[in-house]
Amino acid sequence: MTIKKIAVLTSGGDSQGMNAAVRAVVRSGLFYGLEVYGIQRGYQGLLNDDIFSMDLRSVGDIIQRGGTVLQSARCKEFMTPEGQQKGADILRKRGIDGLVVIGGDGSYHGANKLSKLGINTMALPGTIDNDISYTDFTIGFDTSVSIVVDAINKLRDTMSSHERSSIVEVMGRHCGDIALYAGLASGAETIIVPEVPFDMDEIAERMKQNFAHGKRHSIVVVAEGAGNGENVAKQLVERCETLEPRVTVLGHIQRGGTPTPADRNLASRLGDFAVRMLIAGESAKACGIISNELVLTDIDKVVNSKKEFNMELYELAARLSQ
């Protein structure tokens, strides 16, 4: 089948670099002579037929912007077979031959459903959590880690002044990669993630020893999926009242801001790759990057698997924090 018209949407939680990916899809599509359409507000916009033509001007000056110019939304209706069929019918009525979906796990499930209804689909990993399997990194992850590291640097300054410990809660319900990479990069004394069991007695004892040996601060980075920051602080105080931990929940600040060059480049490569693969006749595929090489994986395979945690990196962080 010859691809003539493609559409792009962003779905689920936004991530820095989504705009760079949209830009790449549009510019690459136009370069290859395709008609390119944008879908506003993800799958909700698809069901509302909120679809518009995109040209070079529509993606001008967006590569450096956070968020998503196409906007995003949750859509309960699309989770139903009737909603999925409606979405596929709208795309066919519009004559759209291919769809590029940018988002996380839920977005991949949606793309997978559409592919089973005969829509040519490509999925790009747009999520700060870095929890998509079959790709080393997701769009937005590098920027989020940079934001967390910057926050920890600032917290370390003030904690050192008062000889206190700091509990930094970061995003990551099921995947602790933000905590892991930011913790390692910032020299955190403790990293708590959902993938690795932890002993609060050991953590409290190590923190006490650090202060006893002259350390002026202690940083604990905890992924939200491993435990509430306030709860971690409470447990530490129960074991040692002198620790005086202060809790900082970084929240949605981790999703905003200008994407790093790494995220812009990753998004640009993946967006262009998705278009070229659609033209080549591929469908129902997830685009990713492994060892700096662009790869295609069946969406079916991705949505039914869990990303492997990098224990080697976790053990390195533990060794360096002694």
Swiss-Prot record:
Pathway: Carbohydrate degradation; glycolysis; D-glyceraldehyde 3-phosphate and glycerone phosphate from D-glucose: step 3/4. Allosterically activated by ADP and other diphosphonucleosides, and allosterically inhibited by phosphoenolpyruvate. Substrate binds at residues 127-129, 164, 171-173, 224, 246, 252-255. It comes from the Bacteria. GO terms for molecular function: 6-phosphofructokinase activity; AMP binding; ATP binding; fructose-6-phosphate binding; identical protein binding; metal ion binding; monosaccharide binding. SUPFAM superfamilies: Phosphofructokinase. Its cofactor is Mg(2+). Belongs to the phosphofructokinase type A (PFKA) family. ATP-dependent PFK group I subfamily. Prokaryotic clade 'B1' sub-subfamily. Catalyzes the phosphorylation of D-fructose 6-phosphate to fructose 1,6-bisphosphate by ATP, the first committing step of glycolysis. This is ATP-dependent 6-phosphofructokinase. The lineage of its organism: Bacteria, Bacillati, Bacillota, Bacilli, Bacillales. The gene is pfkA.
